[in-house]
UniProtKB/Swiss-Prot annotation:
Originating species: Geobacillus thermodenitrificans (strain NG80-2)
Family according to the record: Belongs to the elongation factor P family.
Pathway field: Protein biosynthesis; polypeptide chain elongation
Protein name, entry field: Elongation factor P
Keyword Cytoplasm: yes
Upper lineage: Bacteria, Bacillati, Bacillota, Bacilli, Bacillales
Amino acid sequence: MISVNDFRTGLTIEVDGEIWRVLEFQHVKPGKGAAFVRSKLRNLRTGAIQERTFRAGEKVNRAQIDTRKMQYLYANGDLHVFMDMETYEQIELPAKQIEYELKFLKENMEVFIMMYQGETIGVELPNTVELKVVETEPGIKGDTASGGSKPAKLETGLVVQVPFFVNEGDTLIINTADGTYVSRA
């Protein structure tokens, strides 16, 4: 059991029989009434995001998540195939379960697969990934001083806002937490 006062980003908890990851949290102490913790949680089985409020000091179960290092191999229709790097065992995950993560996955990329009581519940991405720009408007000379941005489509289909100096074929570093441009690789 863990107190909601000890929440931190990335913590996995079990509430109402479901496994949740804490995305955001805020301790609120109103002038009148009891303190509470407002949180934004992601269901690791379904990918659904829910905002939930807990009373300060309330206890929840901490979910013990095991991780296995695996390599993303390929998509087979609606299923995505991963291989354990040590045992060469392959598992398949439905696209619906890893919908967000698919924006960042490339073939042969190493990731951690999250397991809860033997059940595969999701993919843990690295903090950043390198992705190649496949489509963007050409930068206009002299535009770099304005500090604006333009959309760029990456090799996985993800569209991000990038500075004007980024061109097709450039490799970019993308933050997987929010899908934003960090820098050129």
